[in-house]
């Protein structure tokens, strides 16, 4: 996944809008999730307040808490991708936990790739084709331009094609109702 330019606006001391930063955001990768790249473009752990200076809010976990959000791109390798030896080692998994804090803890042991978070995820497939799997065993194939709204349900993403899949997500922290 390439790096992406990020332009951020804010307000000057007089409340006038201005560009406060114009730079490049680099993707995050980890040997513990081989072939997966994520680019965290913006996020916050609480509601935005304006006017502001446009400084990037601090946040520490992959998934936002209630009232928070993340704006992330995600790439998934093609079906014929072979993970490098050692990618399942303790060291590689520890690296993945540091690189994508809170992500691996949402995965289920009994269904590879299946995970659940307390978020509403709005996703857009930018390129490629990906299969959305759900806990009931259903699968939905999504292609470039398709969107999905993921409402805190257990799901997985599988790339069965020969091309890398790239998706754009807005994750919004949500409250989970008692069952």
How should these model regions be labeled?
Residues 1-59:
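N-terminal leader/capping segments at the start of a protein or of a new domain
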Residues 4-6, 68-71, 117-120, 129, ...:
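Extracellular structured ligand-interaction cores
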Residues 7, 11-12, 16-21, 98, ...:
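Double-stranded beta-helix
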Residues 13, 21-25, 47-51, 65-81, ...:
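Glyoxalase I/VOC metalloenzyme domain signal
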Residues 20, 133, 149-150:
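A generic structural signal for residues embedded in beta-strands
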Residues 25, 71-117, 151-154:
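Conserved short histidine dyad/triad with adjacent acidic residue
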Residues 69, 77, 137-139, 143-146, ...:
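Ligand-binding loop in jelly-roll beta-barrel domains
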Residues 109-143:
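A short beta-strand-loop-beta hairpin characteristic of the jelly-roll/cupin
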